[in-house]
A protein has these predicted regions:
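Membrane-interface catalytic loops of GT-C/OST-like multi-pass glycosylation enzymes that act
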Residues: 7-10, 107-112, 169-181
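Hydrophobic transmembrane alpha-helices and their immediate junctions
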Residues: 19, 121-162
Length: 207
């Protein structure tokens, strides 16, 4: 209910991706139920929520049009600062963004996690983020083979997937709480990987 009342379409999509990924990994049969519930949702959700959902992807929606304008400006900034970025923090973004602003569309960040990371840290920063995500997904899929931790691994992977999908539409790390959640995902995944490794080493010693 709290998530619905945020009226954040990006957050709703992130949740949908998380649920789908978890079901796909652990309970594929639930996908049919999820689709049925999604089709029935318009019967129960209030019109104001349905209007928000219907506006996803609409270029006539002012919020969508605004984001696209910001993204175009951000891409132009990346073209000029692709190697080093503009510097850490929103103040660095704001200082440089003024020179690339389109049609007076002011912004305090790029409204996209990946564009913002690339703008602040350059190509090395965005590649580092993508590498961490790749490693996290690899470890999660590896731990899916373990009966002890497969559900936890699937939950972590689903959480990361939803987090990153939401990041396509907003700079989700603007909130310290959300940044903390992301690093908690990675920390839990590292703990699972270490646990699997120690169990494997212990098993080899016994044999």
């Amino acid at each position: 209910l709290c998530l619905v009342l945020t009226f954040s379409r990006g957050a709703w999509l992130g949740l949908a991706v998380s649920v789908f990924v978890f079901a796909l990994l652990k309970e594929p049969r639930l996908i049919v139920l999820i689709v049925i519930l999604a089709l029935l949702a318009p019967m129960f959700l209030p019109p104001v929520v349905m209007n928000r959902i219907a506006s996803i992807g609409s270029l006539e929606d002012s919020s969508n049009a605004y984001r696209i304008t910001i993204w175009i400006a951000a891409l132009r900034m990346i073209k000029d600062y692709w190697l080093t970025g503009v510097g850490l923090g929103l103040s660095a973004f704001a200082r440089v963004y003024r020179e690339y602003m389109i049609a007076g569309a002011s912004a305090i960040h790029a409204h996209n996690l990946y564009l913002e990371i690339c703008l602040e840290l350059g190509v090395v920063g965005i590649l580092s983020l993508l590498w961490m995500v790749f490693r996290a997904f690899s470890e999660a899929l590896s731990n899916m083979k373990s009966d002890k931790s497969s559900y936890l691994a699937a939950g972590i992977l689903a959480g990361i997937a939803g987090h990153l999908f939401h990041g396509l539409f907003d700079y989700v790390w603007y909130s310290p709480r959300i940044v903390m959640a992301f690093w908690m995902y990675l920390g839990l995944m590292s703990a699972l990987a270490w646990g699997s490794y120690t169990e494997k080493v212990a098993g080899e010693k016994l044999t």
